[in-house]
């Protein structure tokens, strides 16, 4: 089935008809601190997109950048590089800071079951292409040099700001995250290459035709995209806060460089809201994955919370909401564990084979419904609701419910199979009346020293995948 996504660039839905080589780029972290769960809501959304594409049969080439050079705290040329600022505060080099927080970021991604990109583009390793892009734009007379910095002249790009609804004629409009800069020709102009900034002791600087300096955040992403994906990009991911400045600046750089349209589809995830504000490091109201773990939450509790809301809706975060997600996830695992422990060896064997080899039409109907939901703008929240409907259904066998749950989990990534097995190892198996009778017969046989019969009953349970454990409280049945 073809995936349809809401395209911020066209303000309409776009169908992805190319199945062969879908080029996807996500704006990664600026590695000057731990990423917070507001950031990770966006990365979970990106993960759901990549897994949905692959689930539907698309061949995906997925890249993410690491901004280790940092970007300015504001858009002014006298702002301070975030990575350099943290390095100075901690008495470390910028390389040590960026390496530490890059590793921390991907460790948290693993805990959240976020897929690792096919290519990680580290900004500091791609300086030559950034310089080359600026040189080409300079040759096209799209840049100007002012106060030691190279600026992009947005008046040269007639469609500048269209995605964000910015009107270049309105000179008095207030732009998000853009400060007044007296060295700009136009309010919307932005720096491509800095040689003059407030932080004079910055460690990351490179020689260029314009002097020793470093690239802007916007140039980094655009140039690395152009180098890795060449002349086209299919899908660009990011948060809604990227729309008004960063992504429209990327479009301007790339399309002026190519003299052609660059990226067809831009997809943006909404904020995670805490106390009626978006979560951000600058506001100081952020929570990390480790903070959740310290309060006895699993990172997968947060992932479950993310699954309950569509990516284009703001998601309110509170410990109460997270606790509700924790309880729901544990209930889901407990119900599936009950189904699983009730299976006979034949059904267990079936679950280890082709999951999509449906034996009943009702299974296929539920599967098709799930595919339909995720194919329309990643409606995973409806997919999760469908899973609960399946759990409660009286028209499906236990093996059918488990089969569908495991299929859905290829996208939801809640580790359902692993969590079930872990759950069963820690809990006694629920047994039926026939099993209870056999256990009682074995107890009597042992009392009568009829060890042959006792062993026969033990072996009978073993063939079904169970282990009998004799305790002071009686015989317990566990999975083998």
UniProtKB/Swiss-Prot annotation:
Catalytic activity: tRNA(Cys) + L-cysteine + ATP = L-cysteinyl-tRNA(Cys) + AMP + diphosphate
Localization of this protein: Cytoplasm
Binding-site positions, ATP: 281
Keyword Ion transport (UniProt): no
UniProt GO BP: cysteinyl-tRNA aminoacylation
Cofactor(s) listed: Zn(2+)
Protein name: Cysteine--tRNA ligase
Gene encoding the protein: cysS
